[in-house]
Amino acid sequence: MIELFSANTPNGWKISIMLEEIGCEYKVTKVDLGKDEQFKPEFIKLSPFGKIPVIIDHGNNESIFESGAILMYLGHKSGKFYDEKDRLNINQWLMAQMGTVGPMIGQHHQFHHYNPGKSEFGEERYFKITKRIYGELDARLKESKFLAGPEYTIADIAT
């Protein structure tokens, strides 16, 4: 049984999607970000930076934090959506999501939805970056059925 510590955010949804896709039994423990539950000492033991999601695989007492690492773990464990022969390409697209797509679009969301008008520089910068990212993703999907190739993978789930 997998225990998923999560909140209603894109990073949390990724793991729920993966668990559903692989047909894994799991339970969700909600982490209330509005009440700063992610910064409680017992949660920091699971996730040193106080970020969701986290899973505990109660079958082997493994605890994994960071959505990309969790997707890799679940893909490897289940044998689904993380094929050995395509692993390098899958990892490249997964890391692009973790390092560029997610953080940059997240910044755009912060400036445009939570703090509009507070930083013209931030709003313009992240709007341009987000527009470019969507353009690159569209270009990739014109040449490939899925991000990492012809098959649905954890890179698609992450993005």
Label each residue range with its predicted role.
Residues 146-153:
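A glycine-rich, coil/turn loop motif that links secondary-structure elements
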Residues 1-125, 131, 138, 145:
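GST-like domain detector, emphasizing the conserved glutathione-binding G-site
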